[in-house]
Amino acid sequence: MGANPESGALSVAGQLLGLAQRMLDLSVDYAAQRKQFGKPIGSFQAVKHHLADVATALEFAKPVLYRAAYALAHNEPNAAVWVSQARLASCEASWLAARHGIQVHGAMGYTWEVDLQMFMKRAWALDSAWGDRALHKARVAEYVLSGAAPLGCGHTFED
């Protein structure tokens, strides 16, 4: 992989997924420690759903990132589209992790005592690095609407 926009965008996608995972880990730990009404807040359904949403977004974004890395490493003709998909999925996962992390932490999430604010700001800063969402969405839309995109799970590793 050389120094090109796709490599940069793929790198950012990986960083965003790592940030999302770290924000989820911090939120899970905090939900287990913080008590309200004599119980950990992680025992409440609303908190569980927030954390489950983030975990699901992360698990859905990982294979997209891996597929993009494979496409880029093997110089596939549509590697840029795969990278854009990974970039979008990773960005959504990191933003969801930040939003729900703040919900779980409450005001503590913004303080210097909790590292969540640092990871959240990093995710926000990386949001527009190596192409903003509009650029990546346009790239994916152009590919899908061109009719050249073989859609479906049977076409994942085909050219």
Region roles according to the model:
Residues A3-D159:
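Alpha-helical interface subdomain recognition
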